Swiss-Prot record:
This is Actin-105. It is found in: Cytoplasm, Cytoskeleton. Actins are highly conserved proteins that are involved in various types of cell motility and are ubiquitously expressed in all eukaryotic cells. Essential component of cell cytoskeleton; plays an important role in cytoplasmic streaming, cell shape determination, cell division, organelle movement and extension growth. PROSITE patterns: ACTINS_1, ACTINS_ACT_LIKE. InterPro entries: Actin (IPR004000), Actin/actin-like_CS (IPR020902), Actin_CS (IPR004001), ATPase_NBD (IPR043129). One of its GO terms (cellular component) is cytoplasm. It comes from Solanum lycopersicum (Tomato). Its EC number is 3.6.4.-. Keywords: ATP-binding, Cytoplasm, Cytoskeleton, Hydrolase, Nucleotide-binding. It catalyses: ATP + H2O = ADP + phosphate + H(+). Its main location: cytoplasm. Belongs to the actin family. SUPFAM superfamilies: Actin-like ATPase domain (SSF53067).
Amino acid sequence: AGFAGDDAPRAVFPSIVGRPRYTGVMVGMGQKDAYVGDEAQSKRGILTLKYPIRHGIVDNWDDMEKIWHHTFYNELRVAPEDDSILLTEAPLNPKANREKMTQIMFETFNVPAMYIAIQAVLSLYASGRTTGIVLDSGDGVTHTVPIYEGYALPHAILRLDLAGRDLTDYLMMILTERGYSFTTAAEREIVRDVKEKLAYVALDYEQELETTKNGKDAEKSYELPDGQIVTIGAERFRCPEVLFQPSLIGMEAVGIHETTYSSIMKCDVDIRRDLYGNVVLSGGSTMFPGITDRMSKEFTALAPSSMKIKVVAPPESKYSVWIGGSILASLSTFQQ
Protein backbone atom coordinates (compact mmCIF):
# COMPACT_ATOMS: atom_id res chain seq x y z
CA ALA A 1 0.00 0.00 0.00
CA GLY A 2 1.12 3.58 -0.59
CA PHE A 3 0.43 6.80 -2.46
CA ALA A 4 0.05 7.45 -6.18
CA GLY A 5 3.14 8.96 -7.75
CA ASP A 6 5.54 7.36 -5.26
CA ASP A 7 8.12 5.03 -6.75
CA ALA A 8 7.80 2.46 -3.97
CA PRO A 9 5.06 1.40 -1.56
CA ARG A 10 5.04 2.96 1.94
CA ALA A 11 3.78 -0.17 3.63
CA VAL A 12 4.50 -3.77 2.76
CA PHE A 13 3.21 -6.51 5.02
CA PRO A 14 1.86 -10.04 4.63
CA SER A 15 -1.91 -10.37 4.38
CA ILE A 16 -2.29 -12.40 7.54
CA VAL A 17 -4.67 -12.01 10.44
CA GLY A 18 -3.71 -13.65 13.73
CA ARG A 19 -6.05 -14.29 16.63
CA PRO A 20 -4.85 -15.25 20.13
CA ARG A 21 -5.08 -18.98 20.79
CA TYR A 22 -5.65 -18.44 24.49
CA THR A 23 -7.54 -15.48 25.84
CA GLY A 24 -6.48 -13.57 28.90
CA VAL A 25 -3.34 -15.54 29.65
CA MET A 26 -1.18 -12.46 29.77
CA VAL A 27 -2.87 -10.07 32.11
CA GLY A 28 -2.23 -6.39 31.54
CA MET A 29 -0.82 -6.89 28.10
CA GLY A 30 -3.71 -4.99 26.60
CA GLN A 31 -4.32 -7.91 24.33
CA LYS A 32 -6.06 -7.21 21.04
CA ASP A 33 -8.61 -9.56 19.55
CA ALA A 34 -6.68 -9.62 16.28
CA TYR A 35 -3.24 -8.78 14.95
CA VAL A 36 -2.49 -7.96 11.32
CA GLY A 37 0.58 -8.30 9.11
CA ASP A 38 4.04 -8.02 10.63
CA GLU A 39 2.69 -7.80 14.15
CA ALA A 40 0.84 -11.09 13.65
CA GLN A 41 4.04 -12.45 12.16
CA SER A 42 6.18 -11.53 15.16
CA LYS A 43 3.67 -12.84 17.71
CA ARG A 44 2.91 -15.96 15.68
CA GLY A 45 3.89 -18.21 18.61
CA ILE A 46 0.73 -17.34 20.54
CA LEU A 47 -1.61 -16.79 17.59
CA THR A 48 -3.57 -18.80 15.09
CA LEU A 49 -2.68 -17.35 11.69
CA LYS A 50 -5.25 -17.11 8.90
CA TYR A 51 -4.84 -16.01 5.29
CA PRO A 52 -8.03 -14.28 4.05
CA ILE A 53 -6.84 -14.48 0.44
CA ARG A 54 -6.82 -17.95 -1.11
CA HIS A 55 -5.42 -18.51 -4.58
CA GLY A 56 -5.54 -14.78 -5.24
CA ILE A 57 -9.22 -14.48 -4.35
CA VAL A 58 -10.63 -13.16 -1.07
CA ASP A 59 -12.64 -15.77 0.81
CA ASN A 60 -12.84 -14.23 4.27
CA TRP A 61 -14.25 -10.71 4.18
CA ASP A 62 -14.14 -10.01 7.92
CA ASP A 63 -10.41 -10.60 8.01
CA MET A 64 -9.93 -8.71 4.76
CA GLU A 65 -11.72 -5.73 6.30
CA LYS A 66 -9.32 -5.89 9.26
CA ILE A 67 -6.38 -5.81 6.87
CA TRP A 68 -7.74 -2.77 5.03
CA HIS A 69 -8.49 -1.03 8.33
CA HIS A 70 -4.93 -1.71 9.44
CA THR A 71 -3.62 -0.38 6.11
CA PHE A 72 -5.50 2.92 6.29
CA TYR A 73 -5.21 3.72 9.98
CA ASN A 74 -1.97 2.12 11.18
CA GLU A 75 0.27 1.93 8.13
CA LEU A 76 -0.62 4.88 5.89
CA ARG A 77 -2.30 6.94 8.62
CA VAL A 78 -4.88 8.43 6.28
CA ALA A 79 -8.61 8.90 6.49
CA PRO A 80 -10.05 6.78 3.66
CA GLU A 81 -12.99 9.17 3.27
CA ASP A 82 -10.60 11.89 2.04
CA ASP A 83 -8.96 10.05 -0.84
CA SER A 84 -9.85 8.03 -3.90
CA ILE A 85 -8.70 4.43 -3.74
CA LEU A 86 -7.21 2.16 -6.39
CA LEU A 87 -7.55 -1.53 -5.54
CA THR A 88 -6.22 -4.45 -7.53
CA GLU A 89 -7.74 -7.84 -8.21
CA ALA A 90 -6.68 -11.18 -9.58
CA PRO A 91 -7.54 -11.85 -13.22
CA LEU A 92 -10.82 -13.80 -13.56
CA ASN A 93 -11.91 -12.57 -10.13
CA PRO A 94 -15.62 -13.42 -9.70
CA LYS A 95 -17.98 -10.49 -10.21
CA ALA A 96 -19.54 -11.03 -6.76
CA ASN A 97 -16.13 -10.47 -5.19
CA ARG A 98 -15.67 -7.20 -7.00
CA GLU A 99 -19.10 -6.06 -5.82
CA LYS A 100 -18.33 -7.04 -2.23
CA MET A 101 -15.01 -5.20 -2.38
CA THR A 102 -16.78 -2.08 -3.67
CA GLN A 103 -19.49 -2.37 -1.03
CA ILE A 104 -16.99 -2.55 1.84
CA MET A 105 -15.01 0.40 0.49
CA PHE A 106 -18.06 2.64 0.10
CA GLU A 107 -20.06 1.55 3.14
CA THR A 108 -17.44 0.73 5.77
CA PHE A 109 -14.68 3.14 4.78
CA ASN A 110 -16.81 5.81 3.03
CA VAL A 111 -14.34 6.36 0.22
CA PRO A 112 -15.36 9.10 -2.26
CA ALA A 113 -14.27 7.18 -5.37
CA MET A 114 -12.59 3.93 -6.26
CA TYR A 115 -11.30 1.90 -9.17
CA ILE A 116 -10.38 -1.79 -9.41
CA ALA A 117 -7.55 -2.69 -11.77
CA ILE A 118 -6.31 -6.10 -12.88
CA GLN A 119 -2.96 -6.90 -11.30
CA ALA A 120 -1.21 -8.22 -14.42
CA VAL A 121 -2.08 -5.13 -16.46
CA LEU A 122 -0.43 -2.95 -13.82
CA SER A 123 2.72 -5.11 -13.88
CA LEU A 124 2.94 -4.58 -17.62
CA TYR A 125 2.58 -0.78 -17.21
CA ALA A 126 5.35 -0.86 -14.62
CA SER A 127 7.68 -2.45 -17.15
CA GLY A 128 6.92 0.41 -19.55
CA ARG A 129 4.85 -1.61 -22.02
CA THR A 130 1.21 -1.71 -23.09
CA THR A 131 1.43 -4.97 -25.05
CA GLY A 132 2.89 -8.24 -23.81
CA ILE A 133 2.15 -11.35 -21.82
CA VAL A 134 2.50 -11.22 -18.04
CA LEU A 135 3.33 -14.27 -15.98
CA ASP A 136 2.24 -13.19 -12.52
CA SER A 137 3.09 -15.58 -9.72
CA GLY A 138 2.56 -14.58 -6.12
CA ASP A 139 1.86 -16.55 -2.97
CA GLY A 140 -1.42 -18.22 -3.80
CA VAL A 141 -1.94 -18.26 -7.53
CA THR A 142 -0.16 -17.91 -10.88
CA HIS A 143 -1.74 -16.34 -13.95
CA THR A 144 -0.67 -15.83 -17.53
CA VAL A 145 -2.35 -12.76 -18.95
CA PRO A 146 -1.88 -11.63 -22.57
CA ILE A 147 -2.41 -7.89 -22.89
CA TYR A 148 -2.79 -5.96 -26.13
CA GLU A 149 -2.66 -2.15 -26.14
CA GLY A 150 -3.51 -2.04 -22.43
CA TYR A 151 -6.42 -4.48 -22.56
CA ALA A 152 -6.27 -7.95 -21.01
CA LEU A 153 -7.64 -10.61 -23.36
CA PRO A 154 -9.95 -12.57 -21.05
CA HIS A 155 -10.42 -15.59 -23.33
CA ALA A 156 -6.69 -16.30 -23.25
CA ILE A 157 -6.03 -15.81 -19.53
CA LEU A 158 -4.91 -19.03 -17.87
CA ARG A 159 -4.75 -19.73 -14.17
CA LEU A 160 -2.50 -22.16 -12.34
CA ASP A 161 -3.15 -22.90 -8.67
CA LEU A 162 0.52 -23.25 -7.96
CA ALA A 163 2.58 -20.49 -6.38
CA GLY A 164 4.77 -19.41 -3.49
CA ARG A 165 2.85 -21.18 -0.75
CA ASP A 166 3.11 -24.52 -2.58
CA LEU A 167 6.84 -24.02 -3.09
CA THR A 168 7.24 -23.36 0.64
CA ASP A 169 5.24 -26.50 1.46
CA TYR A 170 7.37 -28.53 -0.93
CA LEU A 171 10.56 -27.18 0.62
CA MET A 172 9.21 -28.12 4.06
CA MET A 173 8.67 -31.63 2.75
CA ILE A 174 12.09 -32.11 1.15
CA LEU A 175 13.79 -30.66 4.23
CA THR A 176 12.02 -33.36 6.24
CA GLU A 177 13.82 -35.92 4.05
CA ARG A 178 17.03 -34.33 5.31
CA GLY A 179 15.96 -34.87 8.88
CA TYR A 180 14.73 -31.38 9.74
CA SER A 181 11.20 -31.08 11.01
CA PHE A 182 9.10 -28.05 10.10
CA THR A 183 5.36 -28.32 10.67
CA THR A 184 3.68 -25.37 12.40
CA ALA A 185 2.55 -22.10 10.81
CA ALA A 186 5.43 -20.35 12.58
CA GLU A 187 7.94 -22.80 11.15
CA ARG A 188 6.46 -22.44 7.69
CA GLU A 189 7.41 -18.75 7.85
CA ILE A 190 11.00 -19.77 8.61
CA VAL A 191 11.06 -22.12 5.62
CA ARG A 192 9.61 -19.34 3.46
CA ASP A 193 12.56 -17.18 4.46
CA VAL A 194 14.99 -20.00 3.62
CA LYS A 195 13.31 -20.24 0.21
CA GLU A 196 13.52 -16.49 -0.43
CA LYS A 197 17.17 -16.26 0.59
CA LEU A 198 18.68 -19.44 -0.84
CA ALA A 199 16.56 -20.97 -3.61
CA TYR A 200 17.40 -20.58 -7.30
CA VAL A 201 16.22 -22.02 -10.62
CA ALA A 202 18.53 -24.45 -12.42
CA LEU A 203 19.08 -23.87 -16.14
CA ASP A 204 19.26 -27.63 -16.65
CA TYR A 205 17.61 -29.52 -13.79
CA GLU A 206 18.99 -33.01 -14.49
CA GLN A 207 22.51 -31.72 -15.01
CA GLU A 208 22.34 -29.62 -11.85
CA LEU A 209 21.28 -32.70 -9.87
CA GLU A 210 24.32 -34.57 -11.21
CA THR A 211 26.66 -31.69 -10.34
CA THR A 212 25.43 -31.37 -6.76
CA LYS A 213 25.23 -35.11 -6.06
CA ASN A 214 28.79 -35.46 -4.84
CA GLY A 215 29.91 -31.88 -4.23
CA LYS A 216 29.73 -30.17 -0.85
CA ASP A 217 30.37 -26.83 -2.54
CA ALA A 218 26.73 -26.51 -3.58
CA GLU A 219 25.60 -26.49 0.04
CA LYS A 220 24.58 -23.35 1.87
CA SER A 221 23.78 -22.96 5.53
CA TYR A 222 21.02 -21.02 7.22
CA GLU A 223 20.75 -20.12 10.87
CA LEU A 224 17.38 -20.72 12.51
CA PRO A 225 16.04 -18.23 15.09
CA ASP A 226 17.15 -20.58 17.90
CA GLY A 227 20.72 -20.73 16.62
CA GLN A 228 20.52 -24.17 15.03
CA ILE A 229 22.16 -24.38 11.60
CA VAL A 230 20.33 -25.93 8.64
CA THR A 231 22.36 -27.03 5.62
CA ILE A 232 20.63 -27.24 2.26
CA GLY A 233 22.08 -28.38 -1.07
CA ALA A 234 20.07 -29.66 -4.03
CA GLU A 235 16.90 -28.52 -2.23
CA ARG A 236 17.83 -24.99 -3.27
CA PHE A 237 16.86 -25.64 -6.90
CA ARG A 238 14.55 -28.62 -6.34
CA CYS A 239 12.09 -26.25 -4.66
CA PRO A 240 11.42 -23.75 -7.51
CA GLU A 241 11.69 -26.56 -10.10
CA VAL A 242 8.06 -27.27 -9.18
CA LEU A 243 7.09 -24.18 -11.20
CA PHE A 244 8.36 -25.95 -14.32
CA GLN A 245 7.39 -29.49 -13.26
CA PRO A 246 4.24 -29.43 -11.11
CA SER A 247 4.24 -33.24 -11.23
CA LEU A 248 6.93 -33.10 -8.52
CA ILE A 249 4.19 -32.24 -6.03
CA GLY A 250 1.65 -34.52 -7.66
CA MET A 251 -0.15 -31.82 -9.63
CA GLU A 252 -1.46 -32.73 -13.06
CA ALA A 253 -0.94 -29.22 -14.43
CA VAL A 254 1.75 -28.22 -16.92
CA GLY A 255 4.60 -25.90 -15.91
CA ILE A 256 4.63 -22.11 -16.10
CA HIS A 257 6.47 -22.16 -19.45
CA GLU A 258 3.81 -24.33 -21.11
CA THR A 259 0.99 -22.38 -19.49
CA THR A 260 2.42 -19.15 -20.92
CA TYR A 261 2.78 -20.80 -24.32
CA SER A 262 -0.83 -22.08 -24.29
CA SER A 263 -1.97 -18.60 -23.34
CA ILE A 264 -0.22 -17.12 -26.38
CA MET A 265 -1.69 -19.81 -28.63
CA LYS A 266 -5.20 -18.79 -27.56
CA CYS A 267 -4.55 -15.30 -28.94
CA ASP A 268 -5.05 -14.01 -32.45
CA VAL A 269 -2.24 -15.11 -34.72
CA ASP A 270 -1.39 -11.50 -35.67
CA ILE A 271 -0.45 -10.42 -32.16
CA ARG A 272 1.57 -13.49 -31.13
CA ARG A 273 4.86 -12.02 -32.30
CA ASP A 274 4.35 -9.01 -30.01
CA LEU A 275 3.62 -11.31 -27.09
CA TYR A 276 6.64 -13.57 -27.66
CA GLY A 277 8.87 -10.50 -27.66
CA ASN A 278 7.41 -9.12 -24.42
CA VAL A 279 7.15 -11.81 -21.77
CA VAL A 280 7.10 -10.01 -18.41
CA LEU A 281 7.58 -11.90 -15.15
CA SER A 282 5.99 -10.38 -12.08
CA GLY A 283 5.22 -11.28 -8.47
CA GLY A 284 7.26 -12.69 -5.61
CA SER A 285 7.54 -16.21 -7.00
CA THR A 286 9.39 -14.96 -10.09
CA MET A 287 12.22 -13.49 -8.00
CA PHE A 288 14.36 -16.66 -8.02
CA PRO A 289 17.81 -16.14 -9.54
CA GLY A 290 18.05 -17.92 -12.89
CA ILE A 291 14.32 -17.94 -13.64
CA THR A 292 14.59 -15.55 -16.61
CA ASP A 293 17.23 -17.64 -18.39
CA ARG A 294 15.39 -20.88 -17.74
CA MET A 295 12.12 -19.39 -18.94
CA SER A 296 13.80 -18.15 -22.14
CA LYS A 297 15.32 -21.58 -22.72
CA GLU A 298 12.06 -23.50 -22.19
CA PHE A 299 10.13 -20.96 -24.20
CA THR A 300 12.48 -21.05 -27.17
CA ALA A 301 12.02 -24.82 -27.30
CA LEU A 302 8.22 -24.43 -27.54
CA ALA A 303 7.96 -21.44 -29.88
CA PRO A 304 8.42 -21.40 -33.67
CA SER A 305 12.13 -21.30 -34.46
CA SER A 306 12.01 -17.96 -36.30
CA MET A 307 10.35 -16.20 -33.37
CA LYS A 308 12.29 -13.59 -31.42
CA ILE A 309 11.74 -14.23 -27.73
CA LYS A 310 12.38 -11.83 -24.91
CA VAL A 311 11.71 -12.60 -21.26
CA VAL A 312 12.14 -9.76 -18.79
CA ALA A 313 11.90 -9.70 -15.01
CA PRO A 314 12.00 -6.15 -13.64
CA PRO A 315 14.25 -5.95 -10.56
CA GLU A 316 11.36 -4.79 -8.40
CA SER A 317 9.07 -7.50 -9.75
CA LYS A 318 7.69 -8.21 -6.29
CA TYR A 319 6.18 -4.72 -6.26
CA SER A 320 5.57 -4.23 -9.96
CA VAL A 321 1.79 -4.45 -9.56
CA TRP A 322 1.94 -1.66 -6.99
CA ILE A 323 4.29 0.46 -9.11
CA GLY A 324 2.00 0.07 -12.13
CA GLY A 325 -0.87 1.19 -9.92
CA SER A 326 1.09 4.22 -8.79
CA ILE A 327 1.75 5.13 -12.43
CA LEU A 328 -1.88 4.61 -13.47
CA ALA A 329 -3.35 6.51 -10.51
CA SER A 330 -1.12 9.52 -11.06
CA LEU A 331 -2.20 10.03 -14.69
CA SER A 332 -4.40 13.11 -15.02
CA THR A 333 -6.81 11.28 -17.35
CA PHE A 334 -7.30 8.61 -14.70
CA GLN A 335 -8.07 11.04 -11.89
CA GLN A 336 -11.07 12.38 -13.74
